[in-house]
């Protein structure tokens, strides 16, 4: 995923964005709703505080990079009203400063290291690689599994409890629509 190729910047986003999602009817998605989950999963270099967690799977470190020119840019930004921000994860990430990063000991930390590798020992998890999900298997209004192609062959995986769809911002809705989940006018236009 992107945590293996991105810039390693750790930034949660604006509290106002989360609150906006809640105001649009997405209960449980406000800043105060999601903050406990950030705290639970975080292992912050400074330890646990009201805004940061300790002991979680997601390693968050201070940047080891300090260049005089970056400090000069931060000072110059003040002249334009862009004030220093000591913590970009306090719910308001407007300003200038140094981002915290997803690293452990100066080495990239990604979701595979933090979440997947520890879970691979679970008896109810099977990792399938070199496969492409084609559609969701529905049982009435419930998603009961997935159809995927691997090595030119079509396979099915069925879930006893739940299916967690995490195919990204583009492929998650694509898979839902290919499976008949979505706005009827869009689905009809696609011949689904």
Tell me what each language-model feature is.
Residues 2-4, 15-22, 54-59, 156, ...:
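Flexible glycine/proline-enriched surface loops and loop-helix/loop-strand junctions
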Residues 136, 144-192:
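Glycine-rich loop(s) and the adjacent beta-strand/alpha-helix scaffold that form part
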Residues 2-3, 9, 97, 170, ...:
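Gly/Ser/Thr-rich beta-alpha loop segments that engage phosphate groups in nucleotides
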Residues 2, 8, 47-49, 138, ...:
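Short, solvent-exposed loop/turn and secondary-structure capping segments
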Residues 2-39, 188-189:
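N-terminal glycine-rich phosphate/pyrophosphate-binding loop and immediately adjacent elements
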Residues 22-143, 149:
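Conserved redox-cofactor binding core of oxidoreductases
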């Amino acid at each position: 995923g992107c945590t293996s190729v991105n810039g390693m910047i750790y930034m949660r986003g604006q509290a106002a964005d989360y609150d906006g999602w809640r105001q649009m009817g997405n209960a449980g998605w406000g800043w105060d709703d999601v903050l406990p989950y950030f705290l639970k999963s975080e292992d912050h270099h400074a330890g646990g505080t009201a805004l940061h967690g300790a002991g979680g799977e997601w390693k968050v470190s201070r940047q080891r990079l300090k260049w005089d020119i970056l400090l000069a840019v931060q000072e110059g930004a003040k002249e334009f009203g862009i004030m220093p921000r000591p913590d970009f994860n306090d719910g308001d990430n407007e300003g200038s400063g140094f981002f915290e990063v997803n690293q452990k000991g100066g080495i990239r930390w990604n979701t595979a290291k933090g979440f997947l590798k520890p879970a691979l020992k679970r008896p109810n998890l099977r990792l399938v690689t070199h496969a492409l999900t084609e559609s969701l298997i529905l049982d009435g209004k419930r998603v009961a599994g997935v159809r995927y192609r691997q090595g030119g062959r079509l396979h099915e995986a069925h879930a006893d409890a739940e299916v967690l769809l995490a195919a990204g911002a583009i492929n998650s809705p694509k898979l839902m629509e290919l499976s008949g989940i979505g706005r009827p006018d869009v689905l009809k236009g696609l011949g689904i």
